[in-house]
């Protein structure tokens, strides 16, 4: 993986601190620029990753009924304001021809797609499209719920507001009963 330019980020953070009237050399802020650079390296780690590789290994298992991994915690950075948004993803698919993925792979794909400057809508769609392309299932349904700091700490200032997005593909798109089953299982503890 190509490394990010941490020094360039640290220099930019120092400029931002000066621009808002802070002294970046004072105690408490002296190490902040490099801390922010290391944080960006971590939260943007998905930029240099291909999330689809998690589905390079597929298992042949004669299971052709619903698979749901719910409450996958994720965090990302709003590409409009560079502030976090975070929540849970629920990923369901209907295997075809016995092709199933390791359960952890669904969470890894969500992580890799999320760890970059991003929009929730794009994460939702991208996860669904990768699964359709690599797993070749009968259908995929991805639902994401997140709180966006760009709505919580600025602008409309509405803490606790949740945004819910969905991507529905294949069998889930036209089968109300199948969609309802996923929604009921998500609500079920």
Swiss-Prot record:
<dbReference type="Pfam" id="PF01227">
    <property type="entry name" value="GTP_cyclohydroI"/>
</dbReference>
<dbReference type="InterPro" id="IPR043134">
    <property type="entry name" value="GTP-CH-I_N"/>
</dbReference>
<keyword id="KW-0378">Hydrolase</keyword>
<dbReference type="GO" id="GO:0008270">
    <property type="term" value="F:zinc ion binding"/>
</dbReference>
<feature type="binding site">
    <location>
        <position position="81"/>
    </location>
    <ligand>
        <name>Zn(2+)</name>
    </ligand>
</feature>
<dbReference type="GO" id="GO:0046654">
    <property type="term" value="P:tetrahydrofolate biosynthetic process"/>
</dbReference>
<comment type="pathway">
    <text>Cofactor biosynthesis; 7,8-dihydroneopterin triphosphate biosynthesis; 7,8-dihydroneopterin triphosphate from GTP: step 1/1.</text>
</comment>
<dbReference type="GO" id="GO:0006730">
    <property type="term" value="P:one-carbon metabolic process"/>
</dbReference>
<feature type="binding site">
    <location>
        <position position="150"/>
    </location>
    <ligand>
        <name>Zn(2+)</name>
    </ligand>
</feature>
<keyword id="KW-0547">Nucleotide-binding</keyword>
<dbReference type="GO" id="GO:0003934">
    <property type="term" value="F:GTP cyclohydrolase I activity"/>
</dbReference>
<keyword id="KW-0342">GTP-binding</keyword>
<protein>
    <recommendedName>
        <fullName>GTP cyclohydrolase 1</fullName>
        <ecNumber>3.5.4.16</ecNumber>
    </recommendedName>
</protein>
<dbReference type="GO" id="GO:0005525">
    <property type="term" value="F:GTP binding"/>
</dbReference>
<dbReference type="GO" id="GO:0005737">
    <property type="term" value="C:cytoplasm"/>
</dbReference>
<keyword id="KW-0479">Metal-binding</keyword>
<dbReference type="InterPro" id="IPR018234">
    <property type="entry name" value="GTP_CycHdrlase_I_CS"/>
</dbReference>
<feature type="binding site">
    <location>
        <position position="78"/>
    </location>
    <ligand>
        <name>Zn(2+)</name>
    </ligand>
</feature>
<comment type="subunit">
    <text>Homomer.</text>
</comment>
<dbReference type="InterPro" id="IPR020602">
    <property type="entry name" value="GTP_CycHdrlase_I_dom"/>
</dbReference>
<keyword id="KW-0554">One-carbon metabolism</keyword>
<comment type="similarity">
    <text>Belongs to the GTP cyclohydrolase I family.</text>
</comment>
<keyword id="KW-0862">Zinc</keyword>
<dbReference type="GO" id="GO:0006729">
    <property type="term" value="P:tetrahydrobiopterin biosynthetic process"/>
</dbReference>
<dbReference type="InterPro" id="IPR001474">
    <property type="entry name" value="GTP_CycHdrlase_I"/>
</dbReference>
<dbReference type="InterPro" id="IPR043133">
    <property type="entry name" value="GTP-CH-I_C/QueF"/>
</dbReference>
